[in-house]
Design a protein with these regions (language model features):
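C-terminal motif of bacterial Sec signal peptides marking the signal peptidase cleavage site
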Residues: 13-16
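Long, low-complexity intrinsically disordered regulatory regions
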Residues: 239-243, 540
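Short, composition-biased linear "edge" segments at structural boundaries
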Residues: 225-233, 509-518
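Acidic, low-complexity Ser/Thr/Gly/Pro-rich repeat segments typical of extracellular/periplasmic
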Residues: 18-151, 155-206, 218-224, 231, ...
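Short, surface-exposed loop/turn motifs with a glycine/proline- and acidic-biased composition
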Residues: 481-484
Length: 550
């Protein structure tokens, strides 16, 4: 028994000694792993085409961090196995089944995925290249890629995964395959495409949200150039701008909504014609804002006895101009469909502004003669109208005095929807803010655009908070809430009343965009800090290359 315990103790000691652990004592290791060899000759040329694996040796134990996201092989090879997968090792190994192309330089870009086992020190931007020919191609393209609209995150609020690729120019371009050469931009947007062979290429950059190394048309933001690149010598300083992708118009779904059903589309159609198919509903109204993704079909389910006891199959036809179809929904009337009015805006009125309130239904009639506006218990004259831009909103105008508090009483049944649905009584309390609580901003545009443009003040999420549609050189924003803003101009080059983004499918570039950025500013856009009672004046020269996108 004692002999057995002795052997067990020795075995445990040997296992413990064989483990890879952190060194005891001394300073923290900050040195990344170092490559010491590979299974390919040091010249890395004339590599056999039937080679099926790459092995790279290092001077210390390593592990691979997010290797499936970081590893990019150009031209693409479909690999089958990567070592180490999780445990540490002193080498990495990639295996594949493909036969290598003749006279081709292959580049394995590992990004920052190779890290030492103990401290996770990355071997930065590690590349390994070899050639099946008698030389390694050494041309490169380097540059930066950035968001044309100044957005630092993607549409879902996540960090971008920016990929840049080159396609060989052919009679038929297939962008549904991986690019022939591909790389990823670093967090600052800098990229390098290395070990390139001379030839003609089309370049593309995109936010690879699903990590498939292929641009998904209509789903991912994209940057491209219309002209081909005739690569005879290396190119540096290329600038790519990434734009929201134009989506093809496509029906998505129909859902039950307060007062009817809501039909949604991809691609923001200009116009959608919707008609009921069948007897129900017989009385309905369709609302759709130009280039909105939503179409609301309003009807009185209770009045027409639609889906009251059991669900009913309702059918509607739609016509977007490019597609027509008939769709259906099993409709069950919601238990509660009351019409409500509320103030989703602000209880504080900026100087010179009107009071607004909104309803969850479209409004067809109001009876303001029955309403009451008071300040300090004294009635005050006012006018009210349904908004021409949004029929769910009401605008109330009066001589609002700064610093005073107001009370607007809207009795029951004085806000009416198109099929006689009536609102409940409601009271709004609000205050006319003082001018000294706000600031102002004036910008003088040097070499302004020839066409009309939207000039916008954006919040930290790059959402427009204030904007003007103009063609003037001197633009003034007054009564701005104190905050940090960014300044952007969108140009209506085609004079259609909308700003149009790039369309990769037709190789149509976006309309012009200008981002306000002072020389030397490290941020994408210069911040404008608005303070109470402060007036800021700036000159903005739109001819500077750093500010113009196209």
């Amino acid at each position: 028994m004692k002999q057995f315990l002795l052997w067990l103790f020795l075995a445990l000691v040997l296992v413990s000694c064989a483990r890879v652990g952190s060194p005891i004592g001394g300073g923290k290791d900050t040195i990344p792993p170092k490559m010491v060899g590979s299974n390919i000759d040091t010249t890395r040329i004339n590599v056999p085409r039937d080679l099926k694996e790459l092995r790279i040796d290092f001077d210390e134990y390593i592990t691979l961090k997010d290797i499936n996201k970081n590893l990019i092989i150009s031209p693409p090879i479909k690999y089958t196995k990567i070592i180490p997968s999780s445990m540490g090792n002193k080498y990495l190994q990639i295996q594949w089944k493909d036969t290598l192309q003749a006279n081709t330089t292959y580049n394995f870009n590992f990004g920052n995925s190779v890290v030492d086992l103990n401290e996770s020190n990355p071997l930065p931007y590690f590349n390994f290249a070899f050639s099946t020919g008698d030389k390694i191609d050494d041309l490169f393209i380097s540059g930066t890629i950035s968001d044309a609209l100044g957005n630092e995150k993607n549409s879902e609020g996540k960090d971008r995964n920016l990929v840049i690729g080159l396609y060989q120019v052919k009679d038929t371009m297939n962008y549904r395959q991986k690019p022939y050469y591909i790389t990823k931009a670093d967090p600052d947007g800098y990229f390098e495409l290395n070990y390139l062979t001379p030839g003609k290429y089309k370049i593309i950059g995109f936010d690879d949200e699903n990590n498939n190394s292929i641009y998904d048309l209509g789903k991912e933001s994209v940057a491209f150039q219309k002209q081909e690149i005739n690569l005879e010598s290396s190119i540096s300083g290329m600038k790519l701008k990434i734009f929201p992708s134009k989506k093809a118009i496509k029906y998505k779904e129909m859902a039950i909504s307060t007062g009817g059903v809501l039909m949604t589309f991809e691609g923001n159609p200009d116009k959608v014609i919707v008609k009921a198919v069948g007897d129900k509903p017989s009385d309905y109204k369709v609302t759709h804002k130009l280039r909105s993704d939503s179409v609301k079909i309003w009807f009185d389910a209770g009045k027409e006895n639609i889906g009251v006891a059991v669900s009913e199959n309702l059918k509607f036809s739609y016509d977007t101009g490019t597609k027509q179809d008939t769709v259906s929904i099993f409709y069950k009337k919601p238990a509660k469909e009351d019409m409500t009015v509320s103030n989703p805006f602000s209880n504080e009125l900026a100087p010179g502004s009107d009071f607004r309130f909104a309803s969850n239904y479209i409004i067809t009639k109001i009876q303001p003669e029955n309403w009451k506006l008071e300040s300090d218990s004294i009635s005050q004259n006012f006018t009210a109208k349904i908004s021409e831009l949004d029929s769910t909103q009401v605008i109330v105008k009066s001589n609002f005095v700064v610093g005073k508090k107001y009370k607007l009483t809207v009795p029951k049944n004085t806000v009416i929807s198109f099929y006689n649905r009536l609102s409940e009584s409601v009271r709004f309390d609000f205050e006319a803010a003082k001018p000294e609580e706000f600031g102002s901003f004036t910008v003088n545009l040097v070499n302004k655009p020839e066409h009309n443009f939207w000039i916008q003040l954006l919040n930290d999420k790059s959402e427009p908070v204030y904007q003007k549609f103009s063609n003037e050189s001197l633009i003034k924003f007054i009564n701005l809430k104190p905050a940090s803003y960014k300044l952007r101009i969108l140009v209506d080059n085609n004079d259609n009343g909308f700003w149009d983004s790039s369309d990769f499918a037709t190789e149509t570039l976006s309309e012009d965009v200008y981002l306000y950025k002072k020389a030397g500013d490290k941020d994408i856009m210069t911040k404008i800090n608005i303070r109470p009672m402060w007036e800021i004046n700036e000159n903005w020269d739109l001819t500077k290359e750093e500010q113009s996108v196209n």
